[in-house]
Amino acid sequence: MAHNIEPAEIRFTQSARKHRIGKARALYVLEQYQPMEVHDSHSGEQNLRWIGIDDRGLELEIIAVVTPEYLLVIHVMPYRFRRK
């Protein structure tokens, strides 16, 4: 499902910075790729997930929560770290 996400503000949680991926690199993926809806089994909410290659060629996985005021990025990680 395609989303036109254009909140006035994009915020990052501290845990989203755990893998030391810069905000600019994450923002590039958010702008260039379409998100997929994913179900959070812990909260029961629908989140958005992006998988895309940043401006330096690193494939990233990004997960965000949509609120009425802003997009809250809660997870940014190199996709190769994902357990198979």
Language-model features: where?
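Ribonuclease/tRNase effector modules and their secretory precursors
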Residues: 1-84
